Design a protein with these regions (language model features):
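Active-site metal-binding motif and surrounding structural segment of the metallo-beta-lactamase
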Residues: 39-89, 113-118
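General small-molecule cofactor/ligand-binding pocket signal
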Residues: 5, 89, 113-118, 132-134, ...
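Conserved beta-strand hairpin/beta-sheet module of binuclear metal-dependent hydrolase folds
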Residues: 1-47, 85, 145-147, 194-205, ...
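Metal-dependent catalytic neighborhoods of phosphoester/phosphodiester hydrolases
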Residues: 69-76, 98-101, 272-280
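Binuclear metal-ion centers of metallo-dependent hydrolases, dominated by the metallo-beta-lactamase
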Residues: 121, 211-304
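Active-site neighborhood of phospho(di)ester-bond hydrolases with catalytic His/Asp-centered motifs
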Residues: 34-37, 54-62, 90-91, 202-208, ...
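Active-site-proximal loop/helix segment associated with metal-binding centers of metalloenzymes
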Residues: 15, 129-204, 208-217, 223-225
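A gly/proline- and charged-residue-enriched helix-loop-helix capping module
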Residues: 96-105, 114-119
Length: 304
């Protein structure tokens, strides 16, 4: 199961009812944070979630509304006596940006490791899941992210016997381990399992124009969280000028990608009630919802 929470849905500046951009996931004792706007750690505490099992922080880009919550979060992790390394992923210059923000958090009891995004696509293998980063179109280097939990195929006893796999290795191979047998053979999970089954996929992108890379990478996502900076009529020119998206452009991306559902996020401060504009959005993509701070979902593997 993958737990997902929109911690903040605001763009540019926080409002009394809307914190700045951040999204958190939880899977099998591991947590991941995408962006860390002002108020992120307060939002985490409000949800009753914990920062302790945080594996990594993924930054889409380095505008202030996406990174301003980082120093306080790092200090909180330090005060919690964390010693495990923290991975921070982001576009070119990520180490320089983070170290600049750390001017008030210079001494931490844990090391920070950096993964710099400098290609159009990256795949980062984590413990039990993977992160895919893909380049999008903003006025600074910016990336969208997929969080993917793969699911192995079903155990196939006929295949196991055909490959002469001793029963004592079945359990370890089903867990994905590679085993050397007593006769020197290297045994792998594909020798006893069927074809991989559909896993769980979250796609997250914000601060971008609607480029083809988004719908390509969001294809068949279980949840597509996408920027909807403007819902009001007449904002199309502004969206093009500042490299953002309207609600309706996001809806077309969701339709093209055939995602299971879409949540809008990263609203302009001028947008007070996103729900008012959802009628037209749903006429394009019926499975769309207006995201709001604290909106949470648990995604599970599909029943077969």
């Amino acid at each position: 199961m993958l737990d997902i929470c929109l911690l903040g849905t605001g763009g540019m500046m926080p409002l009394p009812y809307r914190r700045l951009t951040a999204c958190m996931t939880r899977f099998n004792g591991h947590s991941l944070l995408i962006d860390c706007g002002e108020g992120t750690q307060v939002a985490i505490k409000e949800r009753g979630w914990s920062v302790k099992p945080l594996d990594a922080i993924c930054f889409t880009h380095f505008h202030a509304d996406h990174v301003s919550g980082l120093p306080g979060l790092l200090l909180t992790l330090g005060n919690a006596e964390r010693t495990e390394p923290l991975l921070i992923i982001g576009p070119r210059g990520v180490e320089k940006v983070v170290n600049s923000l750390r001017v008030i958090a210079t001494e931490l009891p844990f090391p920070i490791e950096f993964y710099e995004l400098n290609e159009k696509e990256h795949v980062i293998q984590m413990d039990g899941y993977k992160i895919e980063a893909f380049h999008v179109k903003h006025n600074v280097p910016c990336y969208g992210y997929n969080v993917i939990i793969p699911r192995a195929g079903k155990f196939d006893p006929v295949k196991a016997k055909e490959n002469e796999i001793p029963m004592k290795y079945w359990n370890r191979l089903q867990k994905g381990e590679t085993v050397e047998s007593e006769d020197g053979r290297v045994l792998t999970s594909n020798m006893i399992l069927g074809e991989p089954r559909p896993g769980i996929k979250l796609t997250y992108c914000t601060d971008t124009r609607p480029v083809p890379a988004i719908s390509e990478h969001a294809k068949n996502a279980d949840l597509f969280i996408c920027e909807g900076m403007y819902g009001e009529e007449g904002k199309e020119k502004k969206a093009r000028e500042y490299k953002h998206m309207t609600f309706y452009e996001a809806a077309h991306l969701a339709k093209d990608a055939d995602v299971k559902q879409m949540w809008l996020t990263h609203y302009s401060p001028s947008l007070v009630r996103a729900e008012e504009f959802m009628g037209k959005v749903k006429s394009i993509f019926p499975r769309a919802k207006a995201g709001k701070d604290g909106k949470t979902i648990t995604l599970d593997f599909q029943e077969e």
